[in-house]
């Protein structure tokens, strides 16, 4: 085991505070409409330019182990806020720095760190209650666009694209952001459920120009295993032929004789049919087949359930108004599933999302949720250079997350004003003076985001904050973009409550841990082994080549 260095008390906190300051100072320059860019050197390729707080935080690694511990704990604030709310990472970092600074001063003055923490917790709980009470729900597409625009640093088109995407696929729908091959940013919407499996044979194509197989008002057979011969399927195939409707087969695979027979029947015109592989792998494949079954009102033919192919009847097949199959994708539009069944499945997937600890699983569950809940929209981000596209993609990701958060919990005035107003409304009292000091720490820290936004815009923070607090209306604030005072919501400067709330709770949680730290342990830097001495004995007179 390597030797460790241990620091205690004040010297530990000083080192930690220095690390917090280095990281927070780099992140906070990006806050607000006039936030500056941060350029990040990459070991390969062009440097990356970003205004995204969490991206900056993730790049910072300090040489001094103790300073690095402080920096990494604040980085945790940014990334946790990003995971929960998807935005507000810079605000969270600014709040954490303010609480840690004030808290460290109070501890140095001899106050009890645990009481300070209790005071901080009391104040945060009251502020969260206040924020939720004054939240305004958003209903219109214009309000959605406003939230998107703000989070994308004032770029109106991004806000409009996000509003349009959410209108088309619903609030639960999947909206993905990809890099475009062109200079333009565009929006593409796929309605219904789409999965990444195409037709198993080009002979299934119904539109040779576009190489697409379109099936109108189709039956859908969902089979968990491979199909290699059609003998067992003949009864159900004959029943489908009688109806004159097309049939889509989704199975683990359709191969050999089974595929050949289907193709021959299709070419002879007796059977309108197409076959695709089931999406996903392993347990996820089972779950996705079940999703399709619920969406189309069918049953998965599975030996686990004791259903054999020979005994399949028409009422076990799913139905959909339209199925469109390309070489790569299958889209099922307007499935015949019961609304109540679909809602039940959506609730079940939401519960799994809450419980899972794996980011990958969460992402896959969210994809499944969206496919059930409405559809998929893709925003393709264009730009003149790769650097510009990456920077824009960061902003669109932020804007998208903020918009989702706004739809969930509502909005409050932006520009740091909501927290500023809450700072004046804190009335909670602690059980002793040290707890009251903890409450005051939060009271002062709540002003820091508004101050930072004003400073980044090049104005005098104290004057602006004073002027905002003079007026006793909740929505009155300062537009850092134009330098005007007025009604923040009317000016379209808004923040999602979820983002502000999460930023404050995460910042206070980590800052409290830092304040109550009394010892720090880090590995001593390894001493490099001495270099090999020059020239070896007994080799005198040899010429070196």
UniProtKB/Swiss-Prot annotation:
InterPro entries: Chaperonin_Cpn60_CS (IPR018370), Cpn60/GroEL (IPR001844), Cpn60/GroEL/TCP-1 (IPR002423), GroEL-like_apical_dom_sf (IPR027409), GROEL-like_equatorial_sf (IPR027413), TCP-1-like_intermed_sf (IPR027410)
SUPFAM superfamilies, per database record: GroEL apical domain-like (SSF52029), GroEL equatorial domain-like (SSF48592), GroEL-intermediate domain like (SSF54849)
EC number annotated for this UniProt entry: 5.6.1.7
An annotated GO BP: protein refolding
Keywords noted in UniProt: ATP-binding, Chaperone, Cytoplasm, Isomerase, Nucleotide-binding, Plasmid, Stress response
Subcellular location: Cytoplasm
Reaction it catalyzes: ATP + H2O + a folded polypeptide = ADP + phosphate + an unfolded polypeptide
CDD domains per UniProt: GroEL
Its job: Together with its co-chaperonin GroES, plays an essential role in assisting protein folding. The GroEL-GroES system forms a nano-cage that allows encapsulation of the non-native substrate proteins and provides a physical environment optimized to promote and accelerate protein folding.
PANTHER family recorded: 60 KDA HEAT SHOCK PROTEIN, MITOCHONDRIAL
Name this polypeptide is given: Chaperonin GroEL 4
Provenance organism: Rhizobium meliloti (strain 1021)
């Amino acid at each position: 085991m390597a030797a460790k260095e241990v620091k205690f008390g004040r010297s530990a906190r000083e080192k930690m505070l220095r690390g917090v300051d280095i990281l927070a100072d780099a992140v906070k320059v990006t806050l607000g409409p006039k936030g500056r860019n941060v350029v990040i050197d990459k070991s390969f390729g062009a440097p990356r330019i970003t205004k995204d707080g969490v991206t900056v935080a993730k790049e910072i690694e300090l040489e001094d182990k103790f300073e690095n511990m402080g920096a990494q704990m604040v980085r945790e604030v940014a990334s946790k806020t990003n995971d929960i709310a998807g935005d507000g990472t810079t605000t969270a970092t600014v709040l954490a720095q303010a609480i840690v600074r004030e808290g460290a001063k109070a501890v140095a003055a001899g106050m009890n760190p645990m009481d300070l923490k209790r005071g901080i917790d009391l104040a945060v709980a009251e502020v969260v209650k206040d924020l939720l009470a004054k939240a305004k729900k958003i209903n219109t597409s214009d309000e959605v666009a406003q939230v998107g625009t703000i989070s994308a640093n004032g770029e109106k088109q991004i806000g409009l694209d996000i509003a349009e995407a959410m209108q088309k696929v619903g609030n639960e729908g999947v909206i993905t952001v990809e890099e475009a091959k062109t200079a333009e940013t565009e929006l593409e919407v796929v309605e219904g459920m789409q999965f990444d499996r195409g037709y198993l044979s080009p002979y299934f194509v119904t539109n040779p120009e576009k190489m697409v197989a379109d099936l109108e008002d189709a039956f859908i057979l969902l089979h968990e295993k491979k199909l290699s011969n059609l003998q067992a399927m003949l009864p159900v195939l004959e029943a489908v032929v009688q109806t004159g409707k097309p049939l889509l087969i989704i199975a683990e695979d359709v191969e050999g004789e089974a595929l050949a027979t289907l193709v021959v029947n299709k070419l002879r015109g007796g059977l309108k049919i197409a076959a695709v592989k089931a999406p996903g792998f392993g347990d996820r494949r089972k779950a996705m087949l079940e999703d399709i079954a619920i969406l189309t009102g069918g049953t998965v033919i599975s030996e686990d359930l004791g259903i054999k192919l020979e005994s399949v009847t028409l009422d076990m097949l799913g139905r959909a108004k339209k199925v469109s199959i390309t070489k790569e994708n299958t889209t099922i539009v307007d499935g015949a599933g019961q609304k109540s069944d679909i809602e039940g499945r959506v609730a079940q997937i939401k519960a799994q999302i809450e419980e899972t600890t794996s980011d990958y699983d969460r992402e896959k569950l969210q994809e499944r949720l969206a496919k059930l809940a409405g559809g998929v929209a893709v925003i393709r981000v264009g730009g003149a250079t790769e650097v510009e596209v990456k920077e824009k993609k960061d902003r669109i990701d932020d804007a998208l997350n903020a918009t989702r958060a706004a739809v969930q919990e509502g909005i409050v005035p932006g520009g740091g004003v909501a927290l500023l107003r809450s700072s004046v409304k804190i009335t909670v009292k602690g059980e002793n003076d040290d707890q009251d000091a903890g409450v005051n720490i939060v009271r002062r820290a709540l002003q820091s985001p508004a101050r930072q936004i004003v400073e980044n815009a090049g104005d005098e923070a104290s004057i602006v904050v004073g002027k905002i607090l003079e007026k006793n209306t909740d929505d009155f604030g300062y537009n850092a973009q134009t330098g005007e005072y007025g009604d923040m919501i009317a000016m379209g400067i808004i923040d999602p409550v979820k983002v502000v709330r999460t930023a404050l709770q995460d910042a206070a949680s980590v800052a409290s841990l830092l304040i109550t730290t009394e010892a720090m342990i880090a590995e001593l830097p390894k001493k490099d082994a001495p270099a090999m001495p020059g020239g070896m004995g007994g080799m005198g007179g040899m010429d070196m080549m």
